[in-house]
């Protein structure tokens, strides 16, 4: 049976009120041509409408491409995601209560697909406890329109767990590279597998239809079965991209690179250096927590500088990982975020989060935006600015050793190091250490329950988490504790009896 269909025929499979699962990580494995087609169909006909959309990672280019191209009031009734990827139309809909919006951890959503594939009704996990995902706080609800409880607190053998509901998926919209006439899908040009296979299996187990966007159609005789990632039994319709350079990009920044596809390694890519500024100071202090051979996850922003500092310090054998499923190699940032070059392996995203949730990471280096006196951290929402947690909650609740990296203030901070002292030239306008934060993405209380080792590194000092909260353990040379640390905080912390100076070598250009 030839499953190759036109775009319009594929969209006809989507009915009003369907629950749709979308694959993708930014634009990697994102079926953008189909998403654009759905948006155009709705604008022209008013259908399909009332959809419930699930996605794991943020899907788009953080501007004007991706799920935002089908984010219209009426088209999407409910939106469940780990990250909004700066989807401004959807954020506006959420703020106006024109959509029921939920924000759950990326690993949890990827595991919902796998649970559905096995016809299991729930994902039971400790991920999300005591964060905004916990029903004792917000239950993952982004707005007032989100009335239904999709997560429940339960106890098993007197231990707390969260029970996330597994929906019945009607439609899966995923992406591969090549299809044969039976619908067998290979992914040789994609940056990684991400959640395409898990979504296909979840949808078929639910009795739904799976639509796959590809670049190529070939005869089954020409496909090596070892290359097939999604068997044709999971596929109902195959749509060939008519404009692959526009709609079938490996990443927002790259149409196609064989190195990003993992076809061979290249010495052209290297971990780039970082100019001497606050980021480099923080990264240099952070790598003091790093050991050779460590398996690591780096968050976006300042933590990305950790890999550069490690190379500079001669720590070259750390194993970097990416939430999308890549292990080893050099993770890429910016418009290629979520991909890597010279990676050792590519796992399905759900399997990567199995590894994370099991405590497989030796260290995680992540950013912070707001922190309260208890040590709770917010990175997911700031008033009307809705970002999402991504994989932050999965990682910070599962990694034994966590290093939070960030400046004391933001929006205008300038420093220099002279005469052996760190000098604050101008303070940032935005305080990060606040009496109250907008929501809890990292729970210090849960961290203590999990017996994690947590420190927080800034350009001017270091805090450690202990059973009583935060304690100041290190200060940069030249920094006045009262005016330049506590003076830019809404609260005070305890000061260690063994307070020490940060190593002066950290500040050498």
Language-model segments: what does each one mean?
Residues 6-19, 167, 285-295:
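Glycine-rich phosphate/diphosphate-binding loops that line cofactor/substrate pockets in enzymes
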């Amino acid at each position: 049976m030839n499953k190759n269909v036109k775009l319009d025929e594929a969209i006809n499979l989507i009915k009003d009120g369907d629950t749709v699962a979308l694959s993708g990580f930014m634009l990697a494995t994102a079926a953008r041509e189909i998403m654009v087609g759905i948006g155009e169909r709705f604008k022209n006909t008013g259908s399909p409408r009332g959809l419930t959309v699930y996605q794991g990672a943020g899907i788009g280019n953080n501007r004007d491409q991706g799920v935002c191209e089908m984010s219209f009031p009426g088209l999407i009734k409910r939106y469940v995601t780990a990250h909004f990827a700066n989807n401004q139309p959807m954020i506006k809909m959420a703020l106006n209560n024109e959509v029921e919006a939920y924000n759950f951890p990326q690993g949890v959503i990827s595991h919902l697909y796998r649970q559905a594939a096995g016809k299991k009704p729930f994902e039971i996990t400790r991920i999300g406890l005591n964060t905004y995902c916990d029903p004792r706080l917000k239950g993952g609800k982004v707005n007032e329109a989100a009335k239904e409880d999709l997560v429940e607190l339960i106890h098993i053998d007197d231990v707390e767990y969260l029970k996330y509901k597994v929906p019945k998926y009607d439609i899966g919209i995923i992406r591969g590279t090549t299809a044969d006439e039976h619908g067998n899908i290979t992914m040789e040009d994609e940056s990684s597998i991400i959640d395409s296979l898990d979504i296909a299996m979840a949808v078929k187990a639910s009795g739904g239809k799976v639509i796959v966007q590809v670049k190529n159609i070939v005869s089954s005789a020409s496909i090596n079965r070892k290359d097939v990632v999604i068997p044709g039994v999971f596929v109902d319709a195959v749509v060939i991209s008519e404009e692959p350079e526009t709609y079938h990009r490996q990443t927002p920044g790259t149409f196609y690179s064989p190195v990003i596809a993992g076809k061979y390694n290249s010495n052209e890519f290297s971990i780039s250096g970082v100019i001497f500024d606050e980021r480099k100071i923080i990264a240099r202090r952070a790598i003091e927590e790093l050991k050779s051979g460590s398996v690591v996850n780096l968050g976006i922003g300042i933590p990305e500088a950790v890999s550069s500092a490690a190379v500079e310090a001669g720590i070259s054998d750390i194993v970097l990982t990416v939430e999308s499923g890549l292990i080893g190699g050099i993770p890429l940032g910016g418009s290629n975020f979520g991909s890597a070059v010279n990676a050792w392996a590519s796992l399905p995203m759900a399997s990567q989060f199995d590894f994370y949730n099991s405590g497989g990471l030796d260290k995680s280096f992540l950013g912070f935006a707001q922190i309260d006196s208890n040590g709770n951290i917010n990175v997911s929402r700031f008033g009307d600015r809705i970002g999402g947690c991504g994989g932050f909650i999965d990682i910070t609740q599962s990694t034994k050793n966590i290093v939070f990296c960030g400046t004391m203030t933001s929006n205008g901070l300038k420093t220099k190091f002279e005469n052996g002292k760190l000098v604050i030239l101008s303070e940032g306008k935005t305080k990060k250490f606040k009496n109250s934060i907008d929501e809890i993405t990292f729970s210090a209380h849960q961290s203590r329950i999990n017996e994690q080792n947590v420190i927080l590194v800034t350009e001017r000092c270091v805090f450690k988490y202990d059973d009583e909260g935060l304690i100041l353990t290190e200060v940069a040379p030249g920094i006045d504790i009262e005016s330049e640390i506590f003076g830019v905080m809404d609260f005070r912390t305890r000061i260690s009896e063994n307070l020490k100076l940060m190593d002066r070598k950290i500040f050498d250009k």
